[in-house]
Amino acid sequence: MAATRSAHTVWNGDLFAGSGQTTLDSSGLGTFDVTWKARTEAAEGKTSPEELIAAAHSSCFNMA
């Protein structure tokens, strides 16, 4: 059985000074703030694409 999941991100501004929000559409678990600074420096309560991929990989690995 195939499972389809979706999320989307809305970004405002340029790469370094801008910010965005990633929404987990399928689960409805929430909307998370993302910034370049949080991705490359201190997280300061924000997530990053790498953290979201790590969470997905970790949960898939444990179900294998």
Where do the model's predicted regions map?
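Extended beta-strand/beta-hairpin segments
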Residues: 1-58, 62-64
